[in-house]
Amino acid sequence: MEYTFAQYQESAQALRDRLGAFRPRCLLILGSGLGSLGNEVESPIAVPYEDVPHMKRSTAPDHAGRFVFGRLAGQDVAVMQGRLHTYEGWSFEDVSYPVRVLRLLGAETLVVTNAAGAVNTAFSAGDIMLITDHIKLFGVSPFAAPIWRSSAPGSRT
């Protein structure tokens, strides 16, 4: 599905209405095994994905399917407890939709976590890895989206 800028704005406004003056500076997308980190957020405001217009729902097992807004480690954050996946039938634009909406709310930093395997024998279970690149074997890029000016989702201007 191709979303319009008005749809992104409508989603962002629905979140503003729930959050009052709170604005997250960082979006944390929690992957498998880390969903409980959302329970550590101070002064949490939980918003189920189904309460956000145009947002798809996570159907993966053990994914709560909600945002948690508040403070974590002294930072104003939005936490996604349960991400969206293409294997659930969602498009790349569906999967990246919440990132663009949160950018409209003011999030400037994105941290994505996941459970991953490695072929490097120097790695041990529980090691932290920094992803610096990716291999895209699909025909469509998850970065593909309409280009908008100014503070629009994904804009660098």
Range-by-range predicted roles:
Residues 1-157:
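Metabolite-binding pocket within alpha/beta catalytic cores that recognizes anionic/polar moieties
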